[in-house]
């Protein structure tokens, strides 16, 4: 995998019209474009189709978490929109993950989100998950992969442990990545792009450091250079 192919650019904008100049600038420099909740809530499948026209696989980051039948139908609809990757919450349980995989079909890789990168140990304890985040992440990752998930979303702090737990097959997608010197924002567990890849990440998700850069394409090239 070329360094640029490891970069997933997050289209964190309220509309595709707002996202399009950024998306067109970075598409030649990255491997994947990500449509998240804000953009999908505004424009639905049209946002996925518009992003896909830029010639890159689209990662639809909806973090589905519902009863299995509902998630299966949502995954089927996501596949019809043209998404290449789709997220669900591993905490929804093994049957929900299996339902997502059934609904998505063979053309879409279902990625299971373990623990959000905005949560630290204190936040996890407050919702009943005592102990270090790594233990919860590894447990959820194993559950999801055993249920058929094609990949795992986890923070750079846990990616090495997840790789050791699930083996070489699943795609490991890592948000919470910030180039050296960049602000952490609302992320609690972060690392640089190079640190994440050295730890075992296949794909790094980059949002604000690209979106807020004066020249997003140059910023993407700089990140690829770090890898």
Swiss-Prot record:
Q: Alphabetically, which GO biological process terms does the record hold?
A: 'de novo' pyrimidine nucleobase biosynthetic process; 'de novo' UMP biosynthetic process
Please give the CDD domains that the UniProt record associates with this protein: OMP_decarboxylase_like
Q: What is its EC number?
A: 4.1.1.23
- Keyword annotations from UniProtKB, A to Z: Decarboxylase, Lyase, Pyrimidine biosynthesis
Which Gene3D superfamilies does the UniProt entry name for this protein? Aldolase class I (3.20.20.70)
- Give the record's subunit note: Homodimer.
What is the protein name given in its UniProt record?
Answer: Orotidine 5'-phosphate decarboxylase
Q: Which organism is it from?
A: Anaeromyxobacter dehalogenans (strain 2CP-C)
Instruction: Tell me the lineage of the source organism.
Output: Bacteria, Pseudomonadati, Myxococcota, Myxococcia, Myxococcales
Q: Which gene encodes it?
A: pyrF
């Amino acid at each position: 995998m070329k360094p640029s192919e490891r970069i997933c650019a997050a289209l964190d904008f309220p509309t595709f019209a707002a996202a399009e100049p950024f998306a067109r600038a970075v598409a030649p420099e990255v491997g994947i474009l990500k449509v998240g909740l804000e953009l999908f809530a505004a424009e639905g499948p049209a946002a996925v189709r518009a992003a896909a026209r830029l010639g890159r696989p689209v990662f639809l980051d909806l973090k589905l978490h519902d009863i299995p039948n509902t998630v299966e139908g949502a995954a089927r609809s996501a596949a019809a929109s043209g998404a290449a990757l789709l997220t669900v919450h591993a905490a929804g349980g093994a049957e929900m993950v299996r339902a997502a995989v059934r609904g998505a079909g063979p053309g879409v890789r279902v990625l299971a989100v373990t623990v959000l990168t905005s949560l630290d140990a204190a936040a996890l304890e407050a919702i009943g998950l005592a102990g270090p985040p790594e233990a919860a992440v590894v447990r959820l990752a194993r559950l999801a992969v055993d249920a058929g998930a094609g990949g795992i979303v986890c923070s750079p702090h846990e990616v090495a442990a997840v790789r050791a737990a699930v083996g070489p097959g699943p795609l490991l997608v890592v948000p919470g990545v910030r180039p050296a010197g960049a602000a952490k924002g609302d992320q609690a567990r972060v690392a640089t792009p190079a640190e994440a890849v050295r730890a075992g990440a296949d794909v790094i998700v980059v949002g604000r450091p690209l979106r807020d850069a004066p020249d997003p394409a140059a910023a993407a090239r700089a990140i690829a250079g770090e890898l």
